[in-house]
Amino acid sequence: MKKLIILCLLMPLCSVMQATVSDSDSIALMRIYKEATIGEIVVKGSRPLVKVENGMLHYNLNALSEKKNVSNVFEAIASLPGIMEKDGALSLNGASSVSVILDGRPTTMTQEQLNTLLKSMSVDRVVNVEVMYSAPPRYHVRGAAINIVTKRAGVYSFQGELKAVYQNQYFSSCEGGANFRVSTPKMAFDLMYDADDVKTMQHYTMDSHHTYQNKVYDISQSAWGRYKGWNHSLRAAYEYNISDKSLFSMAYTTLLSPSDNSVNDVTGNYQTSRLDKYMRSYLHNVSVAFQLAFGLKMSADYTNYHSVNSQLLQSDVNEEDNQLQINGGQDVRKISLSADQTHSLRHDWTLDYGISYVNAYDKDNQYYTDVKGSMPTADTDTRLTEQSTDFYVSCDKTYKSGPSFSLSASGEYYTIGNYHKWAFYPQASVTYFKTPKHVFILSLSSDKTYPSYWQMQSSVTHLDGYQEIRGSSHLRPCSTYSLNATYAFNRKYTFSLFYEDAEDYFTQSMYQSSERLALIFQTRNWNYSRQYGLVINAPFSIGTWFNTQLMAMGLHQHEKCADYFDIPFDRNKWLYQLSAKNTFSVSPHFNIQLDGMYTSPLIQGTYDLTHLLDVDASVKWRFCKDKCALTVRLQDIFNSGLPKTKVNYANQKFDMNTTYYQRSLSITFSYRFGGYKGKEHKEIDTSRFGH
């Protein structure tokens, strides 16, 4: 079975060697064909689904998803060329991180919270998706970004969708949702609700050869973690077309987790333990935006997040009984304001300038009560106020053929506690378009990434009798500089060279303590993390029954930290990644999808991570005049989509295997109704929390 599936994944690699490209293929990067029969004459037409404009890749998400087995906006974006999804997060090949934004406006929700919203959003709510390696400053994000442009009011219509999902990943669970949209030429109202019954099982094994006081202790343990809880998401949005070029919109989003429970049992030759944890949280977000005819856009976004948790840890460490009762919580209030002005000048020049302000207040606490034994504890009760003021100016020049460019400069004044910092961010994008067959894009961007509020606390959280998480109050933000060059051939194949330098890069890693027998998880700053490489994307099809999106990437990693506990490191490694997203159209209403990705061994600090192979399969059947759809999806078929972690560096030596129970099955049924449309109306121009 495994050999058969791998053979199917490799088939397009062999077939593309013999493929020829017709002249009509140059019309669009990816295309769909429609046949209209007039008597005995068959007329074939095509419409472009992707175009390159101002350094961006514009995707028609609805058209691309017609033959993809996707059930929501998040899954549809993950199916785009060069975009991957892993562990609930999106990534863009050639970029270490990517921001996801909605309708080009900043939000105070975290990326994880925004992803939760996208998973409850129907694909037909989206007009197109913009993918860029250097986001223009008017989006108020830096570096690589994915902008999701949603539908505007313009016709009389009433549409809706109901869905039900069965999931199994060791445990069985369910999910249900509904969304409705009512629109007229002047206004539109959207309502979405999703309820997800989450049940997961996690299992890992670890062998730690811990050097302490010139003696090596062999510590082995196995852990089983069970989690269950309900997640609710609700979004209501309203927009009003003041005029053809003026728009008012507002939206309310709430994410609720009223009762999450988890249990983690650990057995081993050094310690046994049990950790019971209870948590509840809620998030409320309100956003308001104005777009006026003379080019002014204003927006305001407010988020209120609250969580409380209670933990009871009972452990037997080296024949010593320990017990810790831990109570904690977090409150975050965050507001974002922005104003942007656009001037369309003579000779296709455009001038943009704007300002944004973000203010966040974070309250964190964690208290130890009912302490028994000798395990170290540290209470935490902190307040943080974070402020950021950004301003920018941007100049664009567009030509019908030849070079088009965008140049901008942004300034930022950032404060948190007693830390104050001015920063300057240059950005440039040049697009050279001579013929439809040859398009060049060169982009330069800079960015700064800040650690989460909880990571910056001087806290200690025990996972069991051997492992603990430590906060880092002196964490510095990471400054990233990126350069990307992309060549699009025949509007079909893309070749991208990239370089990225992340100074003061930070990530969480494990360290065997030299002071006592403890495995420490801590987020620390490194000197830098640098990478450069090449990404190739190549779509290919055979008739109308098969199409694939092939991707190959070669990447060089270089990571250095001169102040990593007592073992500085300076390491580098080459790696490669191959992927194929294959769709077999058995009939107009039945599709089979088989996706695979292979990544060679890689490094992360002192870690050596093994290779991984992630293979997914799905089938989708549309019936009842395409109003109903049934999708069956099997993810990580071979349970090999996560790497194993090995460390054998200086006095650090341990192995950890977390690859168990990654395979999952889901069955999704959806029903769409409505769809009546009146006469067309001119379309509006739509050019960090938690413990």
Which ranges hold each PLM region?
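Short, acidic, small-residue-rich periplasmic hinge/interaction motif at the N-terminus
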Residues: V21-A63, D87, A95-S97
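N-terminal periplasmic accessory domains that precede
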Residues: A28-R31, E40, V73-A76, L114-T116, ...
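Extracytoplasmic beta-strand/coil segments of soluble accessory domains associated
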Residues: F74-M109
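Short acidic/polar hinge/loop motifs at secondary-structure boundaries
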Residues: T107-Y133
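Outer-membrane beta-barrel translocator/receptor signature
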Residues: Y139-I146, G154-Y204, G229-H232
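Face-selective signature of the C-terminal outer-membrane beta-barrel domain
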Residues: M187, N231-S257, L275-P426, T431-K437, ...
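Outer-membrane beta-barrel signature, preferentially recognizing the C-terminal barrel domain
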Residues: K448-L497, D501-E503, L519-G533, A538-S541, ...
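C-terminal beta-signal and adjacent terminal beta-strands/loops
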Residues: F623-H691
